Structure formats: structure tokens, C-alpha cells
């Protein structure tokens, strides 16, 4: 236990040092999306600050936090790409996770204290598939106390650390896919595709309860966010080995979070109007969201109304 806390304190020092360093370097207006493979142990904000420092970016934001003990895909939006980060926050996510059966912890994962132990029933694939089928599709999920959700302005995890538990309302989430990858006498390996707002820790706990023995997560690895898939080699260590030009080549376009949307070219003579946020005419059918280009340069996001009006919604300063 002491070794665990030493690791956490050391990681905190690393994040503190990175934040201090970041205020001393010269910033630049770099824009794009980096598909970071987040390491074990660091917070999402900690790796965000390090990536921002390595790119010397003026602005940066992540697109859905991972707990320190979770690993995998954490898209980092730099500069103008932050204008589209909410599309990734709201997107479907895919995870690979391991659930240890027979033990319930305070946090729903290995960080917490074991508060209950029960025997695990004999497991068969047919039995497990029957239980898992109850968690596929639209379900109700009670958020955990150890979460960043707030009550009266205070994060629930602060209350939980004080031993306070309050009633939480169940919320609707969708489990698009739940695959049993492997299992043994006391653990399950699952592949989960889910909607935003889904807590995989709670899913693991609920599956354990449905089996009558309880459970908690021992590993959580995100492999997909929206249409972005994990690139295993895109680690912090890999970034550190590259020079600035090489790092910039790894960035996706600032509009990459929405590059699946239809695209149109700005009509001749309408560039000034669009860049000033003004509506203009366009000979195009109505589209709720469309990317507007001048040649290969993306100007931003717009709506085309049924009256054939091009209405700017989000402009890119590139």
C-alpha cells in the first residue's frame, strides 16, 4: 500500500513539474488532434498538460477523462480543434476490461478497499451470456459515488472520501455491444461499446451482482472514441523522442472530430461573408451540419437551411 501511494505522489510531482514548465516555454498556435495512448497511473489532466507542453500549444483539451488506472485512447485536441471536442465527448466509446468476481471494493476497481467477499458460482459460457444479455441495449445505471458528478457544487468523490454516501438517481445509458472475450473461475474479460455517460466500473459491479458474487474492475483500456481508433505506438515516450516537425506530422486535421460530415466549397464571392459570421446564399439542399472549405482549407462548420442559406455555426481560424 505504501508503494502504491509513493507512485501516486511521484506522479503528482511529475504533473506539477510539467505544469510549472509549461508556463515558461514559448507557445505557438498549433492546431490538430493527437490520438494519445494514455499510460497507466497518470491522470487525464496530467497527460494533457504534458502533450500540450511537448507541442508548445497555446490551447489544449481532452475529450473524455480516463481514470489514472485506466489506459488507452485519449484524443487530445490542440488549438482550433478544441472547437470540436464536444463531438468526441458525446460520442460512443469502446473499452476492453477485466472484472474480478467475488470481491466488492469501495471504488468499484482495484484502487478501493475490499469491503465484501463472496464465493463465485461455477461459470459456464451459456450462463454468462444469459446474464450479459440483461445488460445489452438500453439500461438504467446508478452513477458511482467515486465520480466527478456534483451535488450542491461538490464532486461526489469528495463526499465519498469522507465516508458520506448520498442517493443517486439512475440514468439511461446504452450498451451497444457487450462481448464475452474470455473467462476463468474468478474473472471475466469483456469488450464493451457504450454511449456517453456509461460507467464501466458500475457495469462490472452490476454484472457481479447479477452473478450473485459481486465484482470490481482490475483493468480498463479504451480502444475507440467515436470514429477514432487507438494507435498503440502513440505514447508519451514516443512523442518525447521526436522533434517538433515530426510531432506535428502525427496531428490529424483540426476538423477531424467531424470529418464524417458532408463537405461543400464556399460559393464564389461569399468568403468574406462566411468568415465574418454572416449568412449568404448557396445552391445546395438543406443540411443541418456541413463542413465548408475554400479549396483544401477548412473554414468551419455551417448549416444549410431549406431556404438555401449558408449559416456559419463554428468558424476555424487557420
Curated annotation (Swiss-Prot):
EC number, as in UniProt: 5.4.99.25
Keywords: Isomerase, tRNA processing
Keyword Calcium: no
A molecular function GO annotation: RNA binding
Gene3D superfamilies to which the protein is assigned, alphabetical: Pseudouridine synthase, PUA domain
Superkingdom per UniProt: Bacteria
Enzyme class: isomerase
Keyword tRNA processing: yes
Stretch forming the signal peptide: none
Single GO biological process annotation from the record: mRNA pseudouridine synthesis
Catalytic reactions of this protein: uridine(55) in tRNA = pseudouridine(55) in tRNA
Active site: 67
Family: Belongs to the pseudouridine synthase TruB family. Type 1 subfamily.
HAMAP family in alphabetical order: TruB_bact
Role according to the record: Responsible for synthesis of pseudouridine from uracil-55 in the psi GC loop of transfer RNAs.
Protein name: tRNA pseudouridine synthase B
